[in-house]
């Protein structure tokens, strides 16, 4: 796998959870003696939802909720077979979405 890289994109609602997961991935990759770039923080997406507090009237009384999606990017440069095995064996929390591109 010469001159290749693995790009790992993490997404989660909890920034502490995503940072812990990124740290686990980086440590597992560094144990196999490969070069790791990241974790690179990507822009946080903020989704704001506005709803009426009352059902039938009082349109001026509204409530807003927001949901933030935190993202991180990790590049593993020139991975070997040990790196792939180490990444497969990682036990990461359920609240983190992982997208891997070879």
Swiss-Prot record:
Domain of life, per UniProt, equals Bacteria
Concerning SMART domains, the annotation shows: Ribosomal_S10
Indicate the segments annotated as coiled coil, or none if absent: none
Q: Which GO terms describe its molecular function?
A: structural constituent of ribosome; tRNA binding
Tell me which PROSITE patterns the record gives. Answer: RIBOSOMAL_S10 (PS00361)
For this record, the Gene Ontology CC terms, alphabetical, are: ribonucleoprotein complex; ribosome
GO terms in the biological process aspect are:
translation
Q: Transmembrane region positions?
A: none
Keywords for the protein's UniProt record, in alphabetical order: Ribonucleoprotein, Ribosomal protein
Q: State the family named in the UniProt similarity comment for this chain.
A: Belongs to the universal ribosomal protein uS10 family.
HAMAP family the UniProt entry points to: Ribosomal_uS10 (MF_00508)
Please give the function described in this protein's UniProt entry: Involved in the binding of tRNA to the ribosomes.
Record's NCBIfam families? Answer: PRK00596.1, rpsJ_bact
The subunit structure is: Part of the 30S ribosomal subunit.
Instruction: Please give the name of this protein.
Output: Small ribosomal subunit protein uS10
Q: Which gene encodes it?
A: rpsJ
